[in-house]
């Protein structure tokens, strides 16, 4: 498959990143993540680097939907954080653990992110809220997945505001007022990711028809 969706998101910590926390909207961040899972689950593979605030959120939404999400999500987790893994990791059967490099956080995260962007073929990357890691992932995504679609959900604030500024210089055609003002995130992601509401959800990607038109719901 060549239409994986990458998610870069976090809720800024006011102690570690007060400036990002000040500009962020935690309610909007949670709503946007929930909406992205709702739109993609059973339709597109969602990939992200494990984050203690985001992974549990994705698990809850997936379980609420009653969809078998084991084949539709791909979670990368650095062994640097092995003693901090959330219990929710156990619910995901497709977790890729990456090397702890010399017990250094920067090198370990770089290793994880390089693997995410070189082992998968993405259609788009979605940036929601976040701190410095969002900027790092944006830069690496552009390097390893050049020319792919990028969606900074500006209304969530945080480091995503910096992603918008970078795109305003390098790819202004990707921007639009809806990134700031459309708070109906389900509608927003259906439109921005070009995923029709008529698309059926499938138990796993292997049985999903390659032709998008063949995935549409049809009356009996």
What would you call each of these model-derived segments?
Residues 8-219:
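Acidic/glycine-enriched connector segments
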Residues 1-5:
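Extreme N-terminal starter segment of soluble prokaryotic enzymes
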């Amino acid at each position: 498959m060549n239409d994986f969706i990458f998610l870069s998101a976090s809720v800024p910590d006011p102690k570690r990143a007060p400036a990002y926390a000040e500009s962020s909207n935690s309610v909007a961040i949670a709503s946007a993540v929930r909406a992205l899972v709702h739109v993609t689950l059973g339709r597109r593979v969602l990939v992200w680097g494990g984050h203690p605030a985001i992974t549990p959120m994705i698990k809850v939404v997936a379980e609420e939907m009653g969809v078998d999400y084991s084949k539709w999500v791909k979670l990368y987790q650095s062994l640097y954080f092995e003693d901090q893994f959330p219990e929710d990791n156990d619910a995901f059967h497709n977790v890729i653990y990456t090397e702890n490099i010399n017990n250094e956080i920067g090198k370990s995260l770089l290793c994880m992110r390089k693997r995410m962007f070189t082992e998968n073929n993405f259609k788009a990357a979605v940036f929601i809220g976040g701190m410095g890691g969002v900027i790092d992932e944006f830069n690496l995504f552009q390097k390893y997945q050049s020319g792919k679609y990028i969606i900074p959900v500006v209304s969530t604030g945080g480091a995503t505001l910096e992603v918008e500024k970078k795109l305003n210089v390098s790819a202004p055609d990707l921007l639009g007022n809806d990134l700031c003002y459309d708070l109906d995130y389900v509608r927003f992601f259906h439109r921005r990711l070009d995923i029709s509401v008529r698309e059926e959800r499938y138990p796993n990607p292997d049985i999903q028809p390659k032709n998008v038109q063949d995935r549409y719901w049809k009356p009996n």
